[in-house]
Amino acid sequence: MKCPFCGGESRVLESRPASDEEAVRRRRECLACGRRFTTMERVEVPPLIVVKKDGRREPFNRDKLLTGVLKACEKRPVPMEVIEKLADDIERDLRSSLDREVPSVVIGERVMEALRQVDGVAYVRFASVYREFKDLNEFREQLEQLLKSR
C-alpha cells in the first residue's frame, strides 16, 4: 500500500480485528519516509436495492425496517434484543440471496412471518398497515387466520 504522506511503499507492522469485528485494522510503516499510519480493511458488500410497489428503487434501509417493527411492537412485551435480532435475521437473509434487488413485498412478508412467531398482536398491527386493511372484515379475517395457526 502506498504511504499517504510520501507515496512510497509500506509494510504491515501489526494486524488485528477492529472493535466491531467486521474489519481488520492494520498498522503500517512507510519504507521510504518511516512514518506510520493505520488502515482499515472491510469486506465490500454490494448495495441491496428495494423495488417498491410503484416500481421505484431505493437502497435497503435497515432503520426503516426496524422502525416498522418497533411501531408494531409498541407497548408489547417484546424485548429490544428480539426486535433487533428479527431485523438482523431478515437483513442477513436478504443479503445472502443472490438477488441484488428485492421487492418490498418480499420484505413485508418476511417481517409478518417473523412477527407472527414473536407476538400475535404485533403481527396483526403490522399486517393491518402493510396490507392496508380497508374495513373490519379484513381485520377479522387476519385475526381468524392467526388464531387457527396457533
From Swiss-Prot:
One of its GO terms (biological process) is negative regulation of DNA-templated transcription. Disulfide bonds: none annotated. PROSITE patterns: ATP_CONE (PS51161). Residues 48-138 form the ATP-cone domain. InterPro entries: ATP-cone_dom (IPR005144), NrdR-like_N (IPR055173), RNR_NrdR-like (IPR003796). The keyword Membrane does not apply. Its cofactor is Zn(2+). Keywords: ATP-binding, DNA-binding, Metal-binding, Nucleotide-binding, Repressor, Transcription, Transcription regulation, Zinc, Zinc-finger. One of its GO terms (molecular function) is ATP binding. The keyword Repeat does not apply. A zinc finger (unnamed) spans 3-33. Binds 1 zinc ion. Belongs to the NrdR family. Negatively regulates transcription of bacterial ribonucleotide reductase nrd genes and operons by binding to NrdR-boxes. This is Transcriptional repressor NrdR. It comes from Symbiobacterium thermophilum (strain DSM 24528 / JCM 14929 / IAM 14863 / T).
